[in-house]
Structures are given as structure tokens and as C-alpha cells.
């Protein structure tokens, strides 16, 4: 009983952190790989690639009619926020995530999110690609977001970059659930086609951008330290950490607080 109480106190101290942190990108857009130099441009309006985009757009419309359960997931995925990411990926990860309960994982994902935005903004405004629902003068499954979508260009898919990069990061936090996390990450991008907000090639480019961002972040010492802290937090929260690990982590936190 006494040992359990001590471990509980140590655990609570180990995972505590200050609230309301401001997200800071690991790299600026100039420091990230330039998508214009290595990622294919969006397909023009003739040829097989664009024909496939149209076929996938029609497939998305069919899915909205045939599979209401999958469509409901796609509609949830349409909310562009870190809260949505944590909600949708908590079950695949095997741990409920939130800013309050998992502050280190939150910090990892929060800084990664703004880094992902840095890689996508320039190509979006360079290509100025029109979204499929606009080309066909139709509505998406998420009409409440259409005004914002009309002001923001289509290529690459920012939702897909965030979803796939989050899946890669969380697979590193918990490698044992990598298959499940990556499956959910693939679904997150697919959801953009299902709701009608993106072409398939937007989603494909988004996954490439996410992979490039993920690789670049691994050259940042700050990122590597935050990943270490996130993995440690996961082990503590899921009961995988040894008492020695918890004590060592708590000792380091105390030293950090004194500085």
C-alpha cells in the first residue's frame, strides 16, 4: 500500500507541467524542404492523372450515400484542430490525450502542427488550385466550412499533412500500435476526398509533405528532446515505466524548475 502511494505521488509530479503554452514551430518555412522543387505539381485538367482525381471525387460522393458511418468519421475529421487530432487518435494510441492529461504529447503535436503549416502555405498560394466542389459547383458534406475552404487553396491538403504527420509522430511514441495509428492516419487523409473538400492528388501530396516534415523535424535537438519526453510520459501514463524511470524523470523536472 505504501509503495503504491509513493509511486502515485511520483507519477503525478512527473507528468505535471505549466498550462497554456504557445506553439513554436521546429522550423520556419524557409528551413523546411521546398515542395516546389521535389513534389509533383497538381495535375492539369487533361490527362490520366486528372481523370483519376475526378473518379475519386465521384467515389467520395458515392461513399457519402452508401456508408454513413464512414462519412460521419470524415465529417469529424474535417475539424482542423489539435483537439480533433487528439480525440481521433487517442484510441489508436492506447491513451486518452489532452493538453491537461498528456502535456508532453500535446507539446510535441502542437509544435509539429505549426511546423506542418509552414511547409504547406507556400505551395497552396503558388499553385492556387481550385477545390473539386467549387469546380463542379456542388456542396461538400461539411457546408459550414465551405466559406473558409473557398478562401484557401486545395494543393496540398493541409488536413492530410497534419493527420499523417501526427500518425507518424504517435507511432514513434508508441511503436507497438504503429499499424493502428498509421491506418487511422491514412483514413484522415481519405476523409478529405469523402467530404468533397480535396482532390485525391491533394491528399497524396499532403502525405509526401508530412513525411518530409517528419524527417526534417528529426534534425532538431529540441524536437528530439520533446519526443523523448512524450515517450516517457506515455510510458508513465500507461504503467510501462519502472519506478526508477519515474524517479529519474521527476528528478530532472525538479532541476529544470530550479533553473
What do the PLM-derived regions correspond to, one by one?
Residues 10-18:
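Hydrophobic h-region of N-terminal signal peptides that target proteins for export
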Residues 159, 198, 206:
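Histidine-centered divalent metal-coordination motifs
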Residues 21-195, 216-222, 226, 232, ...:
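Hydrophobic alpha-helical bundle signature of multipass membrane enzymes
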Amino acid at each position: 500500500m505504501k509503495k503504491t502511494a509513493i509511486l502515485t505521488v511520483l507519477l503525478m509530479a512527473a507528468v505535471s507541467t505549466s498550462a497554456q503554452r504557445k506553439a513554436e514551430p521546429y522550423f520556419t518555412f524557409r528551413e523546411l524542404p521546398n515542395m516546389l522543387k521535389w513534389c509533383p505539381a497538381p495535375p492539369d485538367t487533361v490527362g490520366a492523372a486528372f481523370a483519376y482525381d475526378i473518379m475519386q471525387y465521384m467515389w467520395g460522393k458515392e461513399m457519402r450515400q452508401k456508408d454513413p458511418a464512414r462519412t460521419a468519421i470524415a465529417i469529424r475529421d474535417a475539424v482542423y484542430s489539435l483537439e480533433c487530432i487528439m480525440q481521433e487518435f487517442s484510441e489508436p494510441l492506447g491513451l486518452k490525450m489532452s493538453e491537461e492529461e498528456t502535456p508532453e504529447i500535446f507539446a510535441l503535436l502542437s509544435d509539429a502542427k505549426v511546423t506542418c503549416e509552414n511547409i504547406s502555405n507556400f505551395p497552396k498560394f503558388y499553385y492556387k488550385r481550385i477545390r473539386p466542389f467549387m469546380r463542379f459547383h456542388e456542396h461538400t458534406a461539411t457546408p459550414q466550412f465551405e466559406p473558409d475552404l473557398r478562401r484557401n487553396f486545395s494543393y496540398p491538403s493541409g488536413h492530410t499533412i497534419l493527420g499523417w504527420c501526427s500518425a507518424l509522430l504517435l507511432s514513434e511514441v508508441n511503436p507497438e500500435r504503429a499499424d493502428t495509428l498509421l491506418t487511422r492516419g491514412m483514413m484522415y487523409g481519405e476523409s478529405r476526398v469523402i467530404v468533397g473538400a480535396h482532390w485525391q492528388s491533394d491528399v497524396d501530396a499532403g502525405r509526401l509533405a508530412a513525411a518530409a516534415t517528419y524527417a526534417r523535424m528529426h534534425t532538431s535537438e529540441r524536437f528530439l528532446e520533446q519526443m523523448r519526453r512524450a515517450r516517457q510520459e506515455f510510458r508513465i501514463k500507461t504503467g510501462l515505466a519502472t519506478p526508477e524511470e519515474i524517479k529519474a524523470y521527476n528528478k530532472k523536472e525538479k532541476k529544470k524548475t530550479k533553473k
